[in-house]
Amino acid sequence: AIARNGLSTGFAGKLGDDDFGRFLKETLEKEGVKVLCPELTKEAITTLAFVTLYENGERSFTFARKPGADMLLTKDDIDENEIRQAKMVHAGSVNMTKEPARGANLYAMKLAHDNGKLVSFDVNYRDTLWENEAACKEVADQVYDYVDFLKISEEELYFVGGEENIPAFMKEHGISVV
């Protein structure tokens, strides 16, 4: 949507050398998104997410990812010049479940923050991807000091001490929008 509105957009993530990875890469490029990690990996498949939407509006998620290409993103894949030229960097916890992708994302967010760029983060806790909630919370806790915009669901509010704690949490970490 950002690229369709004429803004410069990039995607820094690993894709597998498979039908889905090639499709995603081609689609992103067709839509005007610069693919910052253009080499497809043969080491893992492109991670797939399947969403089930129930009649009551609730959702459940199933992932094909053992391992997924997104988990193979490394610090070396992060182009420092692209981060320095960006106006904003967005990341989410989904591909921060394991190293080396966790470290690569932390590095990109810190680099963006240190260079005065806006940083957006989606807690996006998915129980099937993490050992437990505490593991996700521990990783998210490492991110907050770099974040300007925090996306968090009602179910994830305990990560920040509950809804009543949001103003204090924002002040403590310098977050502008939750």
Predicted features and spans:
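Beta-barrel outer-membrane channel/assembly domains of diderm bacteria
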Residues: 1-5
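Conserved N-terminal subdomain of the carbohydrate kinase-like
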Residues: 8-93
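Active-site beta-loop-alpha junctions enriched in small/polar residues
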Residues: 66, 94, 124-128, 155
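Short glycine-rich, flexible loops that bind phosphorylated cofactors or substrates
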Residues: 71, 97-98, 128, 159
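Glycosyltransferases and closely related glycan-assembly transferases
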Residues: 99-116
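Conserved phosphate/ATP/ADP-binding segment of small-molecule kinases
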Residues: 115, 129-178
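Short beta-strand/loop segments at the ligand-binding rim of alpha/beta enzyme cores
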Residues: 116-123
